[in-house]
From Swiss-Prot:
The protein, known as: DNA replication regulator SLD2
Pfam families membership: Drc1-Sld2 (PF11719)
InterPro entries the UniProt entry points to: DNA_rep_checkpnt_protein, Sld2
Keywords: Cell cycle, Cytoplasm, DNA replication, Nucleus
Biased composition (Basic residues): 368-379
Keyword Cell cycle: yes
Any one of the GO BP annotations: double-strand break repair via break-induced replication
Compartments it resides in: Cytoplasm; Nucleus
Protein species of origin: Kluyveromyces lactis (strain ATCC 8585 / CBS 2359 / DSM 70799 / NBRC 1267 / NRRL Y-1140 / WM37) (Yeast)
GO molecular function, one term: single-stranded DNA binding
Record PANTHER family: DNA REPLICATION REGULATOR SLD2
Family: Belongs to the SLD2 family.
A single GO cellular-component term on record: DNA replication preinitiation complex
Claim: S-adenosyl-L-methionine is one of the keywords in the record: no
Length: 379
């Protein structure tokens, strides 16, 4: 049986080659017949035409059968019987020797230190080290001392021998606490060289974190000393400050009078100012008449007041304010405050005349254009 099946498997590719060649030949014959039929009748052949010719019908059937056999996969390999072959067994947990080492020396069973209770993972972990030395020797070599803040290749100077650690004397935000902070931090080898010289640090303390150096008692003493100086020497009070304050007050009064007059004048001149602005934006050809502003007479007039008396009064007021006394107003000041300046009121017009709404119409005539161009040129 085995011999017959093996011959079938050998002849299978030959049969496939023969069937494919015969199928190609049949296909060529069928195509030639179809072209001849199309030339003769002017159309492709149909099923009825194929059935009439028995030879052509046989070729069609044979071609269909060969095509079907070529598409179906041969099931020859399924019936092939194979004799069983003994597989190679790999026992990964085998610990018996003799085992060749990297240096070429053979280690027998009695020289190896094998424990029967170890698992496969522990065997892989014990491979580290030289094959000749035992595990006890390796453990002795690994018991060397390691400093936590240094590498085995670099020696680190002892900071505790040179610098004495003291208690923190300053607050948490004090710039004087930088030295104490540097002593308390544990440094790594990367930043160790930066903190070796703590005294010559390139950073300056921040001025924003400083607290007031003087206490409240010291500030109170200084205030009392300054107060005694003013009481003992009242003439030393600078007259320059009194003159400056007096002039500032006088200028403020004049400025307020000017503002009040300007508010009264703006009520009647709002339409004129708006009209002037409108002329500027639209760019009309009419010339806007800009009259000079009226000079304020009050600004040139000198106030009818005694400057020396006012200076003396201001000096007394400033001195009393420094001492914390209440300032008593004089009669002249109260009279000036009680009699404010009388404001002039504008009389309202009785009727709204139609002539107020009159506006000249500028027609773009030829003469007007010439005039406008001449006027623009003179300007």
């Amino acid at each position: 049986m085995n011999g017959i099946k093996e011959t079938d498997t050998v002849n299978a590719p030959l049969l496939l080659v023969i069937s494919s060649a015969s199928m190609d030949a049949l296909k060529i014959e069928i195509k030639l017949w179809e072209r001849a039929f199309e030339k003769e009748h002017g159309r492709l052949p149909e099923k009825d035409d194929i059935k009439k010719d028995k030879e052509v019908k046989r070729k069609y059937k044979q071609y269909a059968q060969l095509k079907k056999d070529a598409t179906v996969k041969p099931s020859v390999e399924v019936n092939v019987e194979q004799t069983p072959v003994k597989s190679h067994v790999n026992n990964t947990k085998a610990e018996f020797g003799p085992t060749p080492q990297m240096n070429g020396k053979l280690v027998s069973i009695f020289e190896m230190q094998v424990s029967a209770m170890k698992t496969h993972q522990s065997d892989q972990e014990d491979i580290v080290g030289s094959p000749v030395r035992s595990n006890d020797l390796v453990r002795r070599q690994l018991n060397f001392s390691i400093t936590p803040n240094s590498s085995p290749m670099k020696q680190v100077p002892n900071l505790s021998a040179n610098i004495v650690v003291s208690r923190p004397k300053y607050g948490p935000n004090s710039p004087m606490r930088i030295g104490d902070i540097g002593l308390q931090l544990s440094e790594t080898p990367k930043t160790l060289g930066r903190t070796l010289d703590l005294k010559s640090s390139p950073f300056s303390p921040s001025p924003l974190i400083k607290r007031p150096v003087k206490t409240l008692s010291q500030l109170a003493k200084e205030h009392a000393i300054i107060k005694d100086e003013f009481e003992s020497n009242p003439e030393d009070f600078s007259e320059f400050t009194a003159i400056r304050t007096l002039m500032e007050k006088l200028m403020q009064e004049e400025h307020m009078d000017i503002i009040e007059e300007g508010d009264e004048g703006t009520v009647g001149n709002e339409t004129e100012s708006n009209y002037v602005r409108k002329v500027k934006t639209i760019k009309k050809r009419t010339k806007a008449k800009m009259r000079p502003a009226a000079l304020n007479e009050k600004s040139t007039n000198i106030p009818d007041k005694n400057v020396h008396e006012q200076l003396a009064k201001l000096k007394e007021r400033e001195y009393n304010k420094m001492l914390g006394k209440e300032v008593e107003e004089s009669e002249s000041d109260s009279e000036q405050q009680s009699n404010p300046p009388v404001k002039k009121k504008q009389r309202k017009s009785k009727y709204n005349l139609v002539s107020n709404n009159f506006k000249r119409l500028n027609l773009p005539t030829k003469a007007g254009r010439n005039r406008a161009s001449k006027w623009r040129g003179r300007r």
